Amino acid sequence: MQLKLEHFNIKIGQHKILLNIADAKELGVNPGDRVRIRGRESISAIADTTDDMVPPGTLGVFSEVYEHFVNWDKPVEVVPAFRSKSASVIKKMMDKKPVVQEEIKTLVNDIVEENLSEIELSAFITSSYIHGMTDDEVEWLTRAMIESGDTIEFDTHPIMDKHSIGGVPGNKISLLVVPIIAANGLLIPKTSSRAITGAGGTADLMEVLCPVEFSSQEVKEITEKVGGALVWGGATNIAPADDKLIRVEYPLSIDPYYQMLASIMAKKGAIGADNVVMDIPVGPSTKVPTVQEGQKLARDLINLGHRLGMNVECAITYGSSPIGRKVGPSLEVREALKVLESMEGPNSLIEKSAALAGILLEMGGAAPRDRGKEIALETLRSGKALEKMKQIIEAQGGDPKITSADIQVGQYTADILASADGYVIEFDNKWIIEIARLAGAPNDKGAGVAIHKKMGESVKKGDPILTIYAEKEFKLETALATAQRTNPIVVEGMLLKRIPGTYGFQ
């Protein structure tokens, strides 16, 4: 059937089209069926129907489909599409039947090419969440994800990389680790994410200083020029299947374990990483609650890395309270720059950054065994890491002269005060993140929270224990009300409760 295009300028995150009910009946297409659209290109899309949004003879297309037909002024041919082979692969996985490598590859290709509906994707995600995957299947999934998008091939090796499992607010260490590694002569092209449920991913933070959206080729050029890069992975077309899976995982609030392994390692494989250090924060409100679970995750990452030809080391790190004392893009960037400028900053930030950078320096041969942390600290003290950070900022289109004093934070503030003398005995990471998000982070770069008291520290009644920053007054009010209701930082005196004797004094 020949239909003229009508563009709906809306991005919905998938290939979807609208058919008039009359045209759909003639084609034999029901809502949720696939169709093949042929014009300048040939693509598949999921059909929906309407009796009034598009007239007969017209095909309504959303932006993701329209991108394939920009400036195409002729009718397109629309025909029913055959059922994807991946549907039967997903059915096998749901039935706990073994699959082969070619089936996994077909599945990933169909995900990237938008040949699967969200229902089918949800079935795949739920199946792997419930039934798990074998080591072979995880390796095949990872390799297919690498091959599905752009890859970077460097002429110089080794290539270093670092990844944090997440779940800890204020984890800004990449802003220190990357320049430390690059300042010691190793290449580290760090592709990072934006925050999905957090108050600021590394890409959100770096965007305070310079652009972060670059093609894979540009990432290679920046890295080869200055030794390192801190960019948003979503702009590179590296492992694009991952973004499409995340789109479905998010509303389900699940992150299947084996898909998480594949997602992490696919991004490392796509940039050609030889040596990778994994930061696994452990604590009650992190993604990895116990040391035992952290050790299992470490073993699985190391094993998968070995299968893919990567050397992986893991660091189990303390995750019960934030890294540093600031949460939110501009606040965190200011804190990180102060460390680079003068070593002035929280010990938790300096120690963790130096420890992880030290492991990478040893893995890359830039430091003898057990001296990596010492060399990382010296790189910070000497100003070499700061100079390298300035080079990275400039290479990515930012101002290399920017300092911590130049970083602007939200103009609206409110303090949470200690209700009694005592000590901080409880710290809820999840509510700290939520309060920062309600204040506007990460979209409002100046929003977030400053933490004045951490676990075990003493306080006096009326001392500020938390300051909320916002760029908009109504967001400050919402964040403040939530902080007062949830009490994310609990203060108690040394005497928790007095229990009187039954018989009184004699």
Curated annotation (Swiss-Prot):
Q: Where does AMP bind?
A: 167, 193-198, 202, 263, 287
Reaction catalysis annotation: AMP + phosphate = alpha-D-ribose 1,5-bisphosphate + adenine; CMP + phosphate = cytosine + alpha-D-ribose 1,5-bisphosphate; UMP + phosphate = alpha-D-ribose 1,5-bisphosphate + uracil
Q: Which GO terms describe its biological process?
A: AMP catabolic process; pyrimidine deoxyribonucleoside metabolic process; pyrimidine nucleobase metabolic process
Q: What is its EC number?
A: 2.4.2.57
Give a Gene Ontology cellular component term annotated to this protein.
cytosol
Which InterPro entries does the entry link to? AMP_phosphorylase (IPR017713), Asp_de-COase-like_dom_sf (IPR009010), Glycosyl_Trfase_fam3 (IPR000312), Glycosyl_Trfase_fam3_N_dom (IPR017459), Glycosyl_Trfase_fam3_N_dom_sf (IPR036320), Nuc_phospho_transferase (IPR035902), PYNP-like_C_sf (IPR036566), PYNP_C (IPR013102)
GO terms assigned for molecular function: 1,4-alpha-oligoglucan phosphorylase activity; AMP binding; pentosyltransferase activity
Q: Where is the active site?
A: 255 (proton donor)
What are the record keywords, sorted? Glycosyltransferase, Transferase
Q: Which cysteines are joined by disulfide bonds?
A: none
State the PANTHER family in the record: THYMIDINE PHOSPHORYLASE
Q: Provide the function of this protein.
A: Catalyzes the conversion of AMP and phosphate to adenine and ribose 1,5-bisphosphate (R15P). Exhibits phosphorylase activity toward CMP and UMP in addition to AMP. Functions in an archaeal AMP degradation pathway, together with R15P isomerase and RubisCO.
Instruction: Report the sequence similarity comment from the record.
Output: Belongs to the thymidine/pyrimidine-nucleoside phosphorylase family. Type 2 subfamily.
The protein's name is AMP phosphorylase
